[in-house]
Regions:
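Extended amphipathic alpha-helical regions
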Residues: 4-181
């Protein structure tokens, strides 16, 4: 039995957004050292194959989270194209950053990250020392989001928006500009 291809609508405008190098860089330079060093010494369980599989899964999840920003920026653009078009046309990245940034939403996200890290970061092998022997500290997860995940997601959103008008005819552009928010 074969499963037919799903026919999903094209949501995103054609683009060439790619921050994979930045994702790999912060993963290898920040995340890996955090989870492989204890008491100042590198840990080595000699499970290299398993480690590679976990690294690929982690990198894939991080990239998926960051690249999802394109769908978020497309949604924001569609909600009020007239607000975005001038900033896109002048390539004003600061204006685009202001249009996509919602500080209250970011704060809620950071609170959720902290809460989830508190729960999922526990080391349940040693229940009497669970708080002291965490797999990862909640504050470190929040810092990763503040320093890497959120900024890279915004970079993806802005890079996508800068390409959002590419290939549109003058009539299509005029229709977008005249659409009420």
């Amino acid at each position: 039995m074969c499963i037919r291809d799903s026919d999903y609508p094209e949501i995103l405008h054609p683009h060439h957004v790619n921050v994979t190098h930045e994702i790999v860089q912060f993963y290898t330079q920040d995340i890996v050292p955090q989870i492989t060093i204890r008491e100042g010494r590198p840990l080595n369980d000699r499970q290299y194959g398993s480690s590679v599989v976990c690294d690929i899964e982690a990198l894939s999840a991080i990239a998926h989270r960051i690249y999802f920003g394109m769908f978020v920026s497309e949604s924001k653009f569609r909600a009020d194209p007239a607000a975005f078009i001038p900033a896109i046309q002048t390539r004003d990245t600061d204006a685009l950053a202001s249009l996509i940034t919602k500080p209250a939403v970011e704060q809620k996200l950071l609170e959720r990250v902290h809460q989830k890290a508190e729960v999922y970061g526990q080391n349940l092998d040693h229940t009497h020392q669970a708080a002291a022997e965490r797999k990862i500290q909640s504050d470190d997860m929040v810092r990763l989001y503040q320093q890497y995940i959120i900024p890279l997601t915004k970079k993806v959103e802005i890079d996508y928006l800068l390409q959002r008008l590419d290939g549109l005819s003058p009539d299509e552009l005029a229709r977008l500009q005249n659409r009420a928010a």
